[in-house]
Amino acid sequence: MAVAELYTQYNRVWIPDPEEVWKSAEIAKDYRVGDKVLRLLLEDGTELDYSVNPESLPPLRNPDILVGENDLTALSYLHEPAVLHNLRIRFAESKLIYTYSGIILVAMNPYKQLPIYGDAIIHAYSGQNMGDMDPHIFAVAEEAYKQMARNNRNQSIIVSGESGAGKTVSARYAMRYFATVSKSGSNAHVEDKVLASNPITEAVGNAKTTRNDNSSRFGKYTEISFDEQNQIIGANMSTYLLEKSRVVFQSENERNYHIFYQLCASAQQSEFKHLKLGSAEEFNYTRMGGNTVIEGVNDRAEMVETQKTFTLLGFKEDFQMDVFKILAAILHLGNVQITAVGNERSSVSEDDSHLKVFCELLGLESGRVAQWLCNRKIVTSSETVVKPMTRPQAVNARDALAKKIYAHLFDFIVERINQALQFSGKQHTFIGVLDIYGFETFDVNSFEQFCINYANEKLQQQFNMHVFKLEQEEYMKEDIPWTLIDFYDNQPVIDLIEAKMGILELLDEECLLPHGTDENWLQKLYNNFVNRNPLFEKPRMSNTSFVIQHFADKVEYKCEGFLEKNRDTVYDMLVEILRASKFHLCANFFQENPTPPSPFGSMITVKSAKQVIKPNSKHFRTTVGSKFRSSLYLLMETLNATTPHYVRCIKPNDEKLPFEFDSKRIVQQLRACGVLETIRISAQSYPSRWTYIEFYSRYGILMTKQELSFSDKKEVCKVVLHRLIQDSNQYQFGKTKIFFRAGQVAYLEKLRLDKLRQSCVMVQKHMRGWLQRKKFLRERRAALIIQQYFRGQQTVRKAITAVALKEAWAAIIIQKHCRGYLVRSLYQLIRMATITMQAYSRGFLARRRYRKMLEEHKAVILQKYARAWLARRRFQSIRRFVLNIQLTYRVQRLQKKLEDQNKENHGLVEKLTSLAALRAGDVEKIQKLEAELEKAATHRRNYEEKGKRYRDAVEEKLAKLQKHNSELETQKEQIQLKLQEKTEELKEKMDNLTKQLFDDVQKEERQRMLLEKSFELKTQDYEKQIQSLKEEIKALKDEKMQLQHLVEGEHVTSDGLKAEVARLSKQVKTISEFEKEIELLQAQKIDVEKHVQSQKREMREKMSEITKQLLESYDIEDVRSRLSVEDLEHLNEDGELWFAYEGLKKATRVLESHFQSQKDCYEKEIEALNFKVVHLSQEINHLQKLFREENDINESIRHEVTRLTSENMMIPDFKQQISELEKQKQDLEIRLNEQAEKMKGKLEELSNQLHRSQEEEGTQRKALEAQNEIHTKEKEKLIDKIQEMQEASDHLKKQFETESEVKCNFRQEASRLTLENRDLEEELDMKDRVIKKLQDQVKTLSKTIGKANDVHSSSGPKEYLGMLQYKREDEAKLIQNLILDLKPRGVVVNMIPGLPAHILFMCVRYADSLNDANMLKSLMNSTINGIKQVVKEHLEDFEMLSFWLSNTCHFLNCLKQYSGEEEFMKHNSPQQNKNCLNNFDLSEYRQILSDVAIRIYHQFIIIMEKNIQPIIVPGMLEYESLQGISGLKPTGFRKRSSSIDDTDGYTMTSVLQQLSYFYTTMCQNGLDPELVRQAVKQLFFLIGAVTLNSLFLRKDMCSCRKGMQIRCNISYLEEWLKDKNLQNSLAKETLEPLSQAAWLLQVKKTTDSDAKEIYERCTSLSAVQIIKILNSYTPIDDFEKRVTPSFVRKVQALLNSREDSSQLMLDTKYLFQVTFPFTPSPHALEMIQIPSSFKLGFLNRL
């Protein structure tokens, strides 16, 4: 294909323009070879004849489909105007600041805050392949992080660009991305420290320049270290070429480093006052630029932020203050006035205030500093000479000193930051972020620009090699033949600078000479390079500068200052003075052999991928140039050992206007930063790369029918390309892609557009022809009709007569009758046939329906009798079995109890006789006890008298204390008056001390009041003790009276026993009735036999009738076939009915044998009952004798019981009184000792406080002597008071000694009584047990007699209480089996929802019924802890979380339903209301369970989101549900080799299947429907948010067709909601933003009405989101129109009235508030069964 073929009519080209660099024009006439001009049509409508020649045709413009591409290398035509136009479209119109250029990310500074850097954006880019999302700094960071994690290879991100282009911000965002995606729970503070290092380095290394308000004046390479888990463990920072000259000089409208202005803004704060600073306008070093304020920046607030970051990194306040001291000293040094003394000398006054502050801050001697600022010492071999300096020389020396100090301080801060970021573990990999200055050229370029451009040459060389390498890797991967690509190698420029005898070496050589000058060095350059090296030039009009042809552009450097800046020397005497500084930090800066910083304990050794020539080390060089070359060599060695990623920051305009595109400035930067070089390298190879599928779908329109019939699409693509492009060198076929040379895609687009244009013409031709033909035929037909009617009318008028009219009328009459006859005959025939068919069909249907009804009726009769017979047989067998068991069990119990009763009665008689003998001795003992009680009464009276005396003594002491209290109050008033007088005399500085002393006095007063209160409490305690003694004496008297009443009451109880014996005798009489019941049993046996025989006869008759009926009409097989499936299933449910039906003929024989066996069993049972009746009659006679004997001795037993109980009641009272007296004595002694110790401790504290106050007062001691004397007096009084208290305590001890004697008597008496009473207690216990056994036997007899009366009544089903009985020791087993070990899978299908919860609540009811608080509390705590544990162990198990969320909610609902509260009992049944808790309120546990349920729900949602999130974007956004409507356009983006496609081919069906799985699992586990709706709503919100966020970040998805696909997928989700009956879950509403976004992509976007409709319809989208979608809208085909910037502005103007969020992304982590509805359980607790699989056999239903 010839190039000239592309220059045809309607194609567009680019022509140069002085204002816009390039402007577009359309070819108005086809170009032919040999034409001298090209007829063009400009955009303003004017025509232009553009001069051309075949070798320099204007560059062609790319098709519109390729305009706005994410990657510049994806453009078909790769040249400067195409790149510039693509950037303009993306930046100025689409507001997209990032664009790829191969492996470079081009970042345009928007000069505006954009909402594209939040955590939601970071999470959206995390895990994505580079190229899947829109270009972003986060995409580059993710690519570096992914390659590091996947390949275990170190990475580097190289950020470069002009000052003000956004390098620092881009590097900061990259570091923030790493800190966010690699954050771990254990080392979360490390990421914060890494990010905190940025504000500090910006404060001390950034400054305001004419181009940038926050320009980095140094290079920085930050290595972020990762461990094997790819988590940040530390960092290390390296800096390059700090601009030290800025410390002492700033150009107009520039500032010094930020930290100086922050310090001056905070000068008035108390912590900075000692620095003696003022405003920034007062210091020479900060006011030189003329503007000390940056608009919109608060330096004081920035200072606070800087201090916070210092603290976050672990820098203490002392360290921070040392740094601020040095900074303040630099400012004061700049203000030191140097005056000229003649022409040869200068001087500094020692009284200079700034000099004094400088020396004071740094700990220097002001005299020496003043001397050596104006003099220098020259040391020769023979002597030392002090040479004075002129004023300019002295000023330079002062400034050199300031620069040196600041450089050392900057290095020291970086070193300390590295120490704060160092780590102890082993570094596995690292990612380096290089923030370095880009290529610079100014009106005056000096040594700094030379070093910067030298560094950029090295980086550009490394960049070119890397691009070349990646191209080669791509070709090898696709098996494309490799062809050599010519690219620019800037090694000659590097050699010019760093080679032997290069510019740097000549500069160092000149610096070594004592009299070296800039002019001599420049002359050497002229001699060595002019006319010898084409890259070095000498300006024509200057002898003080030189020109170097750099990669980016030519730069002219002024030689002035090169030597001075390269030497960077400070005079020795000034260094010696600083080295001897008393300020330790300053002295360390100037030590001769400083220890080099060791940032890391263990660093990875990096090796260069390419052998780099090391710098010449012939001489030891300490110049700035040699140091910079060495550090640059190490940097390049590190970068070569890593995988680089490039970010080129572009400054769109110099006025800092938002989204303003200055073409000239941008082209200049694109040329300088290597973007166009990347384009040029790509253009020489195969820049356009499309997959086979993309090519097939895009250019299928160019294929023939035969080619489309091939099944192999890859082969079809090859055939088509061979046909369309004859030159096979213009494309290559790879494994997965087709590679095109520059212009070939545009050529294919031209062919496609021509084909579409031809097709449109063809369609239009046929459509217009069809319309014209249709119109012609319609007109022709109308003309013919008109002619027909006209001609007919004329013919009729000519031929009409009267005869003709008659004949015509007669013919019509004949026709009418004839046609009527024929129609009637046909109708009658059809009607008869129809009636006959209806009769036969209706008869047939009626007979068939009758037969069916008859069959069903007979089948029902058969089923009725069969089921009745089987039911009766089952009932009778169960009834007989139950009766036999009941009779056998009851008879055995009666026999056993009668035998036990006989044995116990014999022993009882013997014991009663022995008790009668002991009765006489007990009476004597009672009399002795009465005598002792009288003695105890006398002792009580003595105690009462002693108590009165003690009370009088206490009252006297109380009066003394009150008197002493009044004295203390008067002293207190005097002390207060004196203190007030003293405070008026003291100065302001002693306010704190006087306040402290006043507080001490108040403490003493409070202590005194506490002592008084303690005395009052003591007296009250003593009075209470006396009163208690009186009450005890009175109680003893009352007890004596009660004993007498008990003796009288015992007679009454004996009468009760007599009545009980009478009742028992009546019960004995009922035994005779039991014999009568046995006789009735025999009679019933005879009746049963008769009934059985009658049943036999009836069954035989019925069976014969049934068999006869069956044999007459049907056979058995016919009945079996006619039974429906439901009948068969119903038969199977009753068990073995089908087999019974088949054996109806044998039923008679089976029944006969069965009834015969029953008859034999009944006869045997009756014989056994007769034997038992005889035995029972004998036992009853024996019992009657025993009852008579018991009646005789009952009276004596009751008297004995009365006596023993009276003795037992007295002895414990004596014991209790004695023990209480002992406890009171011990308590009194302990309290007195404690009070004495407290008073001593307080006195010691008072003395210590006084002693401390005396030491602190110092000079104020004399003024406060009066107060101390008052304190000593109070101390003495307190000591006296303590002594009085001790005397009182001694007195009390004496009183207690007398009481102790009484207690001894009580103890002796108690011991004697206990010995005597022990035997009596044992005897009494024995008698009580005997009586209890007799009573139990009587009760059991009465129960057995009652049961015997009901022996024939059928026992009904057992009624349960809805509780589960368990033992305390089984609680752990219950929790283990029911909660921890329970596996829901396979169990939930066969049980009621929330069965474990119901079981737990039934256990709670049991504990509540016992009124056991400890048991209930233990069960609830164990249950809650068990649920927490099982959830913690299965945090990733969705089914387990769903199961226990359901059970927790059911358990919570049970606690509410059965709590007894009316609001929860509305829907309960009466039986459920009976099951409510009776004793405890568990509302607190309900709150705890609610909190547990909320935590489970949140984890439950997290797991669902984690499972569904990976399939949302592939299924909702990328999958094309509407086949044939492709929503994507081929991008041709060239991914990195590591960007492997990890998608698993998810579709919309995958999303629906995952949702169905979640829904089914929740329903199976019995989750409340309301909770299911809330969970579905949360999932749908996530689906909508993730899809919408991805749409915002993928420009290729913003098209009309993709909007249709999204709308289709949303309809699938809505249909799913409808199928699951979840329309009311509000889930559909959460998809409203996504629905509106899909609508916005499809709607028309041209007119004002369209803008208004968008404003009114898109209410769920914010203004930022709407504008983002409009700016990102990308047409797929040429017939679609782009959204014009004017339309976007119209919409934005309408949206300005909204007050909504400025955030672009939706928060995918947002959780709706969960509510747990109260749903009462419909299941009755009494009916709940426990499956055996639960292993809860130790629980018993009650």
Swiss-Prot record:
Name of the protein this chain belongs to: Unconventional myosin-Vc
BP-aspect Gene Ontology terms: actin filament organization
Domain Dilute: 1421-1697
Domain of life: Eukaryota
GO molecular function, one term: actin filament binding
Keyword Transmembrane: no
Tissues of expression: Expressed chiefly in non-neuronal tissues. Particularly abundant in epithelial and glandular tissues including pancreas, prostate, mammary, stomach, colon and lung.
Keyword Transcription regulation in annotation: no
